[in-house]
Amino acid sequence: SILFSDSSFCAQQGYDTATIACLFVPNTYEVYWNISIENLMKRMKKENENFWNAQRTIKADALGLSKEEVCTIASIIDEETANNAEKPMIAGMYINRLNAGMPLQADPTIKFALKDFALKRIYHNMLQFDSPYNTYKNTGLPPGPIKIASVAGIYAVLNRTAHDYLYMCAKE
């Protein structure tokens, strides 16, 4: 993880320290224990290129989003819900907020900014925390994903439910 904080290492991979998590596509990979970091990164780049096929890239472009932006939204959605059936609806809401120029107001980004994913509830005083990941204080997307986005999360963004919703209410 020290390498992922190294801006020159991340730049060699085509990312920065905020977006390096976008390189990784969750899957099961077979690699040998003695693989070099260089060869592992080459493998991850190849897997990433295979994942981001023409169809997925066209869908991202149609939304006006880069691959990194898709992964960033997906990472937030993944932290909002574990229910894959809900993810396209939530994706639609966040994309509506972005298109309206509204702050995302995504609680998972506050958890990330505070470095405490165990938080069950976000309180008003937490919303004042100064961070580029605070989507209550800042409009637009945070600098990068808050975790490695799941394939289901990415799929939800690329196939978001089209609706006019700007808000949601969690049951728990």
Write out the residue ranges for each language-model feature:
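Bacterial extracytoplasmic/cell-wall-associated proteins, especially those involved in peptidoglycan
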Residues: 3-172
